[in-house]
Amino acid sequence: MTMLTRRTLLKSAAGMALFAPLLSEAAAQAVSPRRLVIVLECNGIYPVAFLSAGARSSLGSANIGSDIMFSRVYPATARTLTGDAVGSALCLDPLKASSGKISLENRAAVLLGLSSNITGGGHSSGTGALSCAVNGAAATIDAVLAPKLKRTAPYDAIRLGTSSAATPIVYETCSFGPKRPAPILVNPALAYDSIFGSIAKGATAGAERSALFDFARADVQATLATFKGNSNERTKLERYLASLEGLRAREAQLASMAASVQPLLPPAPADNPLIRNAGSPPDSLMWLEAQFQIATTCLLGGLTNTVVLASGSSGFDVHYESIIPTIGRHDLQHGIDTPANWTAIAAVTRKHVELIANLARTLAATPEVGASGSMLDHTAIVFMSDNGEQHHSTGAEWPALVLGGNALGLRTDGRTVIYPEMGQANNRQVSNLFNTLGHAAGDADFNTFGNEGPTRIAPGPLSELYG
């Protein structure tokens, strides 16, 4: 995919409409654009999924054999393999160039050996994966970095996903702080209507939503004018009013952006085969692809600079009918010694990488407004699991794939970094990866994310990934 020149695109009427929200932002703040996308796969990503041929050779093919986990052979100090053909890994072939698609191998970094046993591992670590803390004990990295990245976007973060739960909103993966879970929209039809409702349905729908906020705001203002209760109750009303005013302001901003975002919208739920034909229970991968469509529009349209896509992490017994019918993720993992199950597990991880690669290529083909390069240059995409390296994880290892963000200082140039295994002096932790993202977000003092306490091995970012 060839990136259009900024001059050619922006001179066209379509280009002006398409990038109006980003042009507005660039004019408002002359700072380098920065974005973050985090993708989680539920219930484990096995290290072999990300092990390139070069990394296998470096560690000793005979030492690994057919093992799917092999941290025992990791080096005593971090080993960086540059110019690595990461697409040779079992589940990373979607990064290779094919059928007119650009290669993303030279835009990627694979990290093996990072640990985070403070989270507890298990089937799922809940908010632990993104907080480097005990489940429910701290804010997750998306919530911490979103305010730093938001700038003029109407949404600080968009959180989407899939789940085996029957509810359309779940709360187990992201958190604003201790015991303050953040909602994730796990039904793509609801996500579409919630995010794009007033944009997709036109000015009338937007006016109706604004009128509802105006009515509620006037009602609270009238109550406050005559309120004689205690100060705590008054504070609650004042916070409610502030929330309504924020929502009303966002609705007005969305209305101003509608014309430029409408051409980017994915198919409406009733017309989208990924939603309409997903079955019951829905094929999690079809719904996830629909959520990726929504996320892509949000990024291209300037609706947010922070996205979380949580695949089954808040209810992990999801189904993948397009890959292996009738069996849920939990039973699939328990039967991993069955060749068909292992093949399916690898195919599921590979599908996640394919969806990530599609997003990355779209961003790579889109010129950044207000800075040089493409949107991918200014967007860090991180793919990892919600519990570590296997079905019943201890948090001993969290394989990770990082794409893009080279303009933010990330060394995503086609490298694999292998860290010593947990328990070794030079092991590094997932919190170091998140510290790296904090530095990439522009905060040079972001060095102690996570609640490891005395078990923290080292502060700061990963020097092999950032600098």
Predicted regions span which residues?
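Ligand-binding pockets and gating/stacking loops
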Residues: 2-467
